Amino acid sequence: VAPAEMGWGTHERWMPANAHVHADDGPCNQICLAQPGMETWVRSWVPSGEILGMIIRHGESYTMSNHLTVRDESGKAIYRPTVHYSYCPSNEAINSVLELRMRNWERQPEQRIMNNEIISGRDELGVLLLGHDYTGWWTGTRLSIDEARSIVDGQSATTLQVAGSVIAAFKWMVASPNEGVCVPDDLPWKSVLADARPYIGEIHSAPTDWDPLKTRNDLFPGFGNTSRLDLTDPWQFKNFLSPTPS
Protein backbone atom coordinates (compact mmCIF):
# COMPACT_ATOMS: atom_id res chain seq x y z
CA VAL A 1 0.00 0.00 0.00
CA ALA A 2 3.05 2.28 -0.03
CA PRO A 3 2.92 4.97 -2.73
CA ALA A 4 4.29 4.27 -6.19
CA GLU A 5 7.81 5.72 -6.44
CA MET A 6 10.12 5.90 -9.44
CA GLY A 7 13.17 7.62 -10.83
CA TRP A 8 11.86 10.33 -13.15
CA GLY A 9 13.52 10.85 -16.53
CA THR A 10 14.50 14.17 -18.05
CA HIS A 11 12.79 13.14 -21.31
CA GLU A 12 9.32 13.04 -19.77
CA ARG A 13 6.89 15.61 -21.22
CA TRP A 14 3.97 14.87 -18.90
CA MET A 15 3.57 14.23 -15.20
CA PRO A 16 0.62 12.58 -13.44
CA ALA A 17 -1.69 15.02 -11.67
CA ASN A 18 -1.18 13.23 -8.34
CA ALA A 19 2.62 13.20 -8.59
CA HIS A 20 4.78 14.75 -5.88
CA VAL A 21 8.27 15.95 -6.76
CA HIS A 22 11.24 15.77 -4.41
CA ALA A 23 12.67 19.25 -4.83
CA ASP A 24 14.48 20.12 -1.59
CA ASP A 25 17.15 17.72 -0.37
CA GLY A 26 19.23 15.10 -2.13
CA PRO A 27 19.54 14.46 -5.87
CA CYS A 28 15.81 15.11 -6.50
CA ASN A 29 15.69 12.30 -9.04
CA GLN A 30 12.38 10.74 -7.96
CA ILE A 31 8.67 11.34 -7.95
CA CYS A 32 6.00 9.53 -5.97
CA LEU A 33 2.31 9.18 -6.75
CA ALA A 34 -0.46 9.67 -4.21
CA GLN A 35 -1.73 6.14 -4.81
CA PRO A 36 -0.59 2.68 -3.73
CA GLY A 37 2.05 0.99 -5.82
CA MET A 38 -0.14 -2.11 -6.02
CA GLU A 39 -2.79 0.01 -7.76
CA THR A 40 -0.35 1.52 -10.25
CA TRP A 41 -0.15 -0.83 -13.23
CA VAL A 42 2.23 -0.47 -16.15
CA ARG A 43 2.95 -2.36 -19.35
CA SER A 44 6.24 -4.21 -19.51
CA TRP A 45 7.90 -7.24 -21.09
CA VAL A 46 9.75 -10.37 -19.98
CA PRO A 47 11.02 -13.27 -22.12
CA SER A 48 7.67 -15.05 -21.68
CA GLY A 49 5.89 -12.09 -23.25
CA GLU A 50 4.13 -8.83 -22.43
CA ILE A 51 2.94 -8.30 -18.86
CA LEU A 52 1.05 -5.84 -16.71
CA GLY A 53 2.93 -5.19 -13.50
CA MET A 54 2.66 -3.09 -10.37
CA ILE A 55 5.04 -0.22 -9.60
CA ILE A 56 6.10 -1.55 -6.21
CA ARG A 57 8.61 0.88 -4.74
CA HIS A 58 12.14 -0.43 -4.49
CA GLY A 59 15.48 1.12 -3.62
CA GLU A 60 17.04 0.46 -7.01
CA SER A 61 14.53 2.76 -8.70
CA TYR A 62 16.19 5.54 -6.75
CA THR A 63 19.82 4.44 -6.84
CA MET A 64 19.94 3.39 -10.50
CA SER A 65 18.34 6.58 -11.78
CA ASN A 66 20.73 8.57 -9.58
CA HIS A 67 23.80 6.69 -10.83
CA LEU A 68 22.71 7.17 -14.45
CA THR A 69 22.08 10.91 -14.11
CA VAL A 70 24.32 13.23 -16.14
CA ARG A 71 24.65 16.80 -14.88
CA ASP A 72 26.08 19.94 -16.42
CA GLU A 73 28.66 22.19 -14.78
CA SER A 74 25.97 23.95 -12.75
CA GLY A 75 24.69 20.66 -11.35
CA LYS A 76 21.49 20.62 -13.41
CA ALA A 77 20.39 17.19 -14.57
CA ILE A 78 20.60 17.07 -18.38
CA TYR A 79 20.03 13.33 -18.74
CA ARG A 80 18.26 10.80 -16.56
CA PRO A 81 16.19 7.74 -17.48
CA THR A 82 12.88 6.87 -15.91
CA VAL A 83 13.40 3.81 -13.68
CA HIS A 84 10.67 1.82 -11.98
CA TYR A 85 9.67 -1.70 -11.04
CA SER A 86 6.98 -3.65 -12.87
CA TYR A 87 6.06 -6.57 -10.63
CA CYS A 88 3.59 -9.20 -11.83
CA PRO A 89 2.93 -11.68 -9.00
CA SER A 90 1.15 -15.02 -9.25
CA ASN A 91 -2.58 -15.29 -9.89
CA GLU A 92 -3.15 -16.20 -6.24
CA ALA A 93 -1.27 -13.12 -5.04
CA ILE A 94 -3.22 -10.85 -7.38
CA ASN A 95 -6.46 -12.33 -6.04
CA SER A 96 -5.26 -11.71 -2.49
CA VAL A 97 -4.55 -8.07 -3.36
CA LEU A 98 -8.07 -7.74 -4.75
CA GLU A 99 -9.46 -9.14 -1.51
CA LEU A 100 -7.41 -6.61 0.45
CA ARG A 101 -8.87 -3.76 -1.61
CA MET A 102 -12.39 -5.09 -1.04
CA ARG A 103 -11.66 -5.08 2.70
CA ASN A 104 -10.79 -1.35 2.44
CA TRP A 105 -7.12 -2.12 3.13
CA GLU A 106 -7.85 -4.03 6.35
CA ARG A 107 -5.45 -6.94 6.27
CA GLN A 108 -6.92 -10.42 6.02
CA PRO A 109 -7.03 -12.17 9.43
CA GLU A 110 -5.07 -15.13 8.09
CA GLN A 111 -1.99 -15.13 5.85
CA ARG A 112 0.01 -17.92 4.27
CA ILE A 113 3.07 -18.20 2.08
CA MET A 114 2.56 -20.58 -0.82
CA ASN A 115 5.27 -23.17 -1.20
CA ASN A 116 4.41 -26.85 -1.51
CA GLU A 117 1.13 -25.94 -3.23
CA ILE A 118 3.04 -24.56 -6.24
CA ILE A 119 2.98 -27.13 -9.03
CA SER A 120 4.42 -25.14 -11.95
CA GLY A 121 5.71 -21.74 -12.95
CA ARG A 122 8.86 -19.70 -13.28
CA ASP A 123 10.31 -16.47 -11.94
CA GLU A 124 11.69 -14.11 -14.57
CA LEU A 125 13.63 -11.41 -12.76
CA GLY A 126 15.59 -8.87 -14.73
CA VAL A 127 16.08 -5.40 -16.16
CA LEU A 128 14.37 -4.19 -19.34
CA LEU A 129 16.42 -1.44 -20.98
CA LEU A 130 14.38 0.56 -23.49
CA GLY A 131 14.80 3.38 -25.97
CA HIS A 132 18.14 2.62 -27.63
CA ASP A 133 19.26 1.30 -31.03
CA TYR A 134 18.11 -2.22 -30.15
CA THR A 135 14.68 -0.88 -29.05
CA GLY A 136 14.72 -3.09 -25.95
CA TRP A 137 17.07 -5.45 -24.16
CA TRP A 138 16.15 -7.76 -21.31
CA THR A 139 18.84 -9.20 -19.07
CA GLY A 140 18.17 -11.23 -15.96
CA THR A 141 17.57 -14.70 -14.56
CA ARG A 142 14.88 -17.33 -15.06
CA LEU A 143 14.26 -20.00 -12.44
CA SER A 144 11.43 -22.54 -12.47
CA ILE A 145 9.86 -24.09 -9.39
CA ASP A 146 11.28 -27.51 -10.35
CA GLU A 147 14.79 -26.09 -10.74
CA ALA A 148 14.49 -24.27 -7.41
CA ARG A 149 13.49 -27.46 -5.58
CA SER A 150 16.37 -29.34 -7.17
CA ILE A 151 18.79 -26.75 -5.75
CA VAL A 152 17.25 -26.42 -2.26
CA ASP A 153 14.44 -28.78 -1.34
CA GLY A 154 11.24 -27.18 -0.10
CA GLN A 155 11.96 -23.72 -1.49
CA SER A 156 10.26 -21.69 -4.21
CA ALA A 157 11.85 -19.86 -7.12
CA THR A 158 11.10 -16.50 -5.53
CA THR A 159 12.65 -17.26 -2.14
CA LEU A 160 15.69 -18.89 -3.71
CA GLN A 161 16.52 -15.96 -5.98
CA VAL A 162 16.21 -13.57 -3.05
CA ALA A 163 18.21 -15.82 -0.72
CA GLY A 164 20.98 -16.22 -3.29
CA SER A 165 21.41 -12.46 -3.47
CA VAL A 166 21.40 -12.14 0.32
CA ILE A 167 24.05 -14.87 0.67
CA ALA A 168 26.26 -13.11 -1.88
CA ALA A 169 25.81 -9.76 -0.13
CA PHE A 170 26.68 -11.24 3.27
CA LYS A 171 29.85 -12.78 1.85
CA TRP A 172 30.88 -9.39 0.52
CA MET A 173 30.08 -7.70 3.85
CA VAL A 174 32.24 -10.18 5.77
CA ALA A 175 35.10 -9.67 3.33
CA SER A 176 34.69 -5.86 3.28
CA PRO A 177 34.00 -4.72 6.87
CA ASN A 178 35.22 -1.15 6.39
CA GLU A 179 33.23 -0.12 3.32
CA GLY A 180 30.44 1.62 5.24
CA VAL A 181 26.86 1.87 4.01
CA CYS A 182 26.47 0.67 0.42
CA VAL A 183 23.57 0.01 -1.91
CA PRO A 184 23.51 -2.97 -4.30
CA ASP A 185 24.71 -0.81 -7.20
CA ASP A 186 27.92 -0.06 -5.27
CA LEU A 187 29.01 -3.69 -4.92
CA PRO A 188 31.46 -5.49 -7.24
CA TRP A 189 28.95 -7.20 -9.49
CA LYS A 190 31.21 -9.92 -10.86
CA SER A 191 32.07 -11.44 -7.48
CA VAL A 192 28.55 -10.95 -6.10
CA LEU A 193 27.00 -12.60 -9.16
CA ALA A 194 29.46 -15.49 -8.92
CA ASP A 195 28.47 -16.13 -5.30
CA ALA A 196 24.74 -15.94 -6.12
CA ARG A 197 25.07 -17.98 -9.31
CA PRO A 198 24.25 -21.43 -7.83
CA TYR A 199 20.83 -20.21 -6.69
CA ILE A 200 19.43 -17.98 -9.43
CA GLY A 201 18.88 -20.27 -12.41
CA GLU A 202 19.43 -19.51 -16.09
CA ILE A 203 20.98 -16.18 -17.05
CA HIS A 204 19.18 -14.73 -20.07
CA SER A 205 20.24 -11.66 -22.06
CA ALA A 206 18.66 -10.84 -25.42
CA PRO A 207 17.08 -8.02 -27.46
CA THR A 208 13.37 -7.43 -27.95
CA ASP A 209 11.46 -5.21 -30.37
CA TRP A 210 8.67 -4.58 -27.83
CA ASP A 211 7.45 -1.11 -26.94
CA PRO A 212 4.31 -0.08 -25.02
CA LEU A 213 2.49 1.13 -28.15
CA LYS A 214 3.33 -1.64 -30.60
CA THR A 215 1.00 -4.32 -29.24
CA ARG A 216 -1.84 -2.17 -27.89
CA ASN A 217 -5.33 -3.39 -28.65
CA ASP A 218 -7.69 -0.57 -27.75
CA LEU A 219 -11.22 -1.95 -27.63
CA PHE A 220 -12.84 1.47 -28.08
CA PRO A 221 -10.56 3.44 -30.43
CA GLY A 222 -11.51 7.08 -30.78
CA PHE A 223 -13.18 7.13 -27.39
CA GLY A 224 -11.88 7.18 -23.84
CA ASN A 225 -8.35 8.28 -23.13
CA THR A 226 -6.45 6.97 -26.16
CA SER A 227 -5.94 10.56 -27.31
CA ARG A 228 -3.71 11.02 -24.25
CA LEU A 229 -1.09 8.67 -25.66
CA ASP A 230 2.10 10.20 -27.04
CA LEU A 231 2.46 8.53 -30.43
CA THR A 232 5.59 10.55 -31.23
CA ASP A 233 7.62 8.95 -28.43
CA PRO A 234 6.76 5.44 -27.22
CA TRP A 235 9.03 5.84 -24.20
CA GLN A 236 6.87 8.43 -22.45
CA PHE A 237 5.66 7.20 -19.05
CA LYS A 238 2.00 7.85 -19.94
CA ASN A 239 2.27 5.19 -22.67
CA PHE A 240 3.25 2.57 -20.10
CA LEU A 241 0.44 3.31 -17.64
CA SER A 242 -2.57 1.01 -17.67
CA PRO A 243 -5.21 2.25 -17.92
CA THR A 244 -4.19 5.24 -20.02
CA PRO A 245 -4.29 8.38 -17.83
CA SER A 246 -7.27 10.68 -18.17
Positions of predicted regions on the chain:
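C-terminal catalytic/substrate-binding lobe primarily of soluble NAD(P)-dependent oxidoreductases
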Residues: 1-246
